[in-house]
């Protein structure tokens, strides 16, 4: 069985703003991890307790999609892809619908680990929604002290 994660949220911001946040270093630092660098075609994500960084190839469709394909990093993540697809909101009158997918984990990724990963991504999605609505950064992985 292929292991994948799918999450959805309607956020209180227009597509251009959500796309900017998802596709830039400043945006990613505001809701996910302060230790990152994102360019038009590459990204690096670091985490306080992780022994290695995640490196990813980035592809985008402005206003529609931000996709990151892992080229090296955590066990079972190399070769996986996460993406944010932007669309009309599904359950709100205004804003942007964000459909998040993470798929392509390596064979052997334990179901319990996938569950923990899904829970973490859900919390990161909440941070994204809060940031695009308020403009107040609250990264899930802040800088280590």
Regions found by a protein language model. Give the residues of each.
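Hydrophobic ligand-binding cavity/cleft-lining segments
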Residues: 1-37
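Hydrophobic pocket/interface hotspot
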Residues: 18-22, 28, 43-45, 57, ...
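Short strand-connecting beta-turns/loops that link adjacent beta-strands
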Residues: 14, 50, 61-63, 89-94
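Short, flexible loop/turn segments with low-complexity composition
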Residues: 135-145
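Short, surface-exposed coil-to-beta transition loops
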Residues: 4-6, 51-55, 77-83
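Glycine-rich portal/gate segments that line the openings of hydrophobic small-molecule binding cavities
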Residues: 26-74
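Beta-strand/loop substructures that line and gate deep hydrophobic ligand-binding cavities in soluble
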Residues: 73-123, 128-130, 139-141
